[in-house]
Amino acid sequence: MSETELINNDHMALWYDPVSKFVHHKIKKTLPKGAFEEMLSTGADYLEKYGMKKWLSDDSNVVAITKEDSEYGDKIWAPRVIKAGFTYWAVVMPTSAMGNLQVTRFVKEYRERGVTVEVFDSVDAAKTWLNSK
């Protein structure tokens, strides 16, 4: 495995893969205040630093994203990473109904912003797709 760990705690994990050139996050359980922003901001730093265009979101354990976190992603993070060249997003969808509904909305919004987004049931399938890009 060529992924380098950036964050790993009870709530989330974040890696980057310098070989396949993607950032990968996993939300393990409901995030405390500030954690979502920390995870996305750290990932954006690596995306910019290494000229990466791909992101893998393992959101299978997402129950819900807070309004505050959703607004951060929409207003701060998205413009930043799209400007940096973010082009491909692989999403492992949440198993919870509420989480699935929210992430489905995010997928639609990012497609409208010009990002190529595909949804998956497993991390392995998501990685295979990203590696083909």
Q: Over which residues does each language-model region extend?
A:
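Amphipathic, Lys/Arg-enriched alpha-helical "gate/interface" segment within cytosolic domains
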Residues: 2-133
